[in-house]
Design a protein with these regions (language model features):
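Active-site region of glycoside hydrolase catalytic domains
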Residues: 1-240
Length: 240
């Protein structure tokens, strides 16, 4: 699985456009190796320019060629917007320095861009680049959830998933993407791998546990649980 995030330039400037291209080149490195069985030219050039000299033998290259994948599995949570204000395209080493705030997009409680169209962009970009079946294995919204009178109302999660599934459908029906399946992240609240927090909740099932260690681990279904149950039963036809 790869973590995929389409890259947008913050402005139409040439530097921002080139920076976005360089950023994508670095991001695609891992999946390029898995699909094509060889290192991208741009990455090999970067390695040489920065004095890294990995000992890659002809046997290593044969192993890479023989170990390519049959499909591409990826996670999608957000798009990435980049700006050349702090780092120029040819000086890109620390990717985080290039990341900028996109003023046209909403953001999650943790500052992640909410961009449903981005999942369609991801599917189209990966299809055009790799010509392989795709499988979305993670997609969801990390948010603060509250229990009110024994219930957890999370319309923001339903809205997020509804819009992303709709864009996914467009990619399949309109754009011709070969999509094997879709898995939201995740079925149940758990410690976020990205931040180490329990309060950053993704699940359809609420777990009574908090960052300070309090909570008895009891579980309750959120509103999104019942909504997604209906989505599954209708094979995605009923998103209301």
């Amino acid at each position: 699985m790869i973590n995929y995030s389409p890259v947008r330039p913050l402005t139409p400037s040439s530097d921002d456009a080139l920076l976005a291209d360089k950023f994508e080149q670095r991001r695609d490195f891992f999946s390029d190796v898995q699909v094509f069985g060889e290192y991208p030219k741009g990455v090999e050039a970067y390695i040489k320019q920065h004095g890294y000299r990995p000992d890659i033998t002809d046997e290593d290259r044969v192993v890479l060629k023989e170990g390519t994948v049959d499909y591409v599995a990826f996670s999608y949570y957000q798009t990435t917007t980049v700006s050349s204000e702090k780092v120029k395209p040819d000086e890109l080493s620390d990717l985080e320095k290039a990341v900028a705030v996109n003023p046209t997009l909403e953001r999650s409680d943790w500052g992640w861009e909410i961009d449903p169209t981005g999942i369609r962009l991801s599917l189209n970009h990966l299809t055009d680049r790799y010509h392989l079946p795709l499988f979305i294995v993670e997609n969801g919204l990390g948010a603060f959830d509250k229990v009110e009178d024994g219930e957890i109302h999370d319309p923001y999660r339903v809205d997020y998933l509804k819009k992303h599934i709709s864009e996914m459908e467009k990619a399949v029906e309109i754009d011709g993407v070969d999509l094997m399946g879709y898995l939201p992240w995740g079925p149940i609240d758990l410690v976020s791998a990205g931040t180490g927090q329990m309060d950053k909740r993704y699940g359809f099932i609420y777990v009574n546990k908090f960052d300070d260690g309090t909570g008895d681990l009891t579980r309750e279904r959120k509103d999104s649980f019942y909504w997604y149950k209906k989505v599954i039963a209708s094979n995605g036809a009923d998103l209301a």
